[in-house]
């Protein structure tokens, strides 16, 4: 039943059903850890397997987006990155939602003032790899935060310095995860998609509108996002009869893009309908 409603309104592959996370520990949005075999770890193993199956052996770049804020794209991107690192692969997650960076909070970063926006603005005089931080979660996982919020984010990601940055990262990492802006709110992500090999569209149960699948389907049909798939986030596994209450979620306030920003499911979201 978890997939049935979604399968009726999109033909895109569903690469995962992610349960609701109530984890509010000091480690925040990270729920995947080494030597762990709980439901969440197994869920992200399945997501990892499905996404890698979609990609060719020489493809490295995975883009993660959503329609609006609060659907859990940073949560999904971060835990997928951890799961990939547990394979022994060298992983970097890049904060390309540079209007509202979320990786600082998700990974408890100490150097919050540095990031990719500095390289995009001035690639000739910026050492990109000096902006990359090794995570304290797994030595195989590194983070390239968004950096200072620029006045012109759309123009910045449209520059040739973005593919330059990705080319540099490809020399150092096996996979690159791009945590991008919500595609239903700004055009940044469509511009970023030119450097991606696969795209994950995060939808949240009891929150994502059924009408949003019109946008998702159009993006897939018109190939505006490469190799597009979707993830259903925030399923309440305790409820015996869980329906996707699409059309009842409320996120109008989030369009201000300056309001409270949910970087992971259950973190920072307000007034979400519960059935």
What are these regions (language model features)?
Residues 74, 95, 179, 197:
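Conserved G/P- and acidic residue-centered "switch" motifs that form tight phosphate/ATP-binding loops
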Residues 171, 185-206:
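Inter-motif core of Ras-like GTPase G domains
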Residues 51, 146-187:
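Phosphate-binding/switch loop-helix module in NTP-utilizing enzymes
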Residues 140-141, 228:
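Short, conserved active-site loop motifs that form the nucleotide-linked donor/cofactor pocket
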Residues 160-163, 191-193, 274-275:
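NTP-binding/hydrolysis catalytic cores, primarily Walker-type P-loop NTPases
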Residues 61-63, 90-92, 141-143, 175-177:
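Residue-level preference for the first positions of well-ordered beta-strands
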Residues 2-90, 96-102, 106-116, 122-125, ...:
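Short boundary/hinge segments that flank catalytic cores
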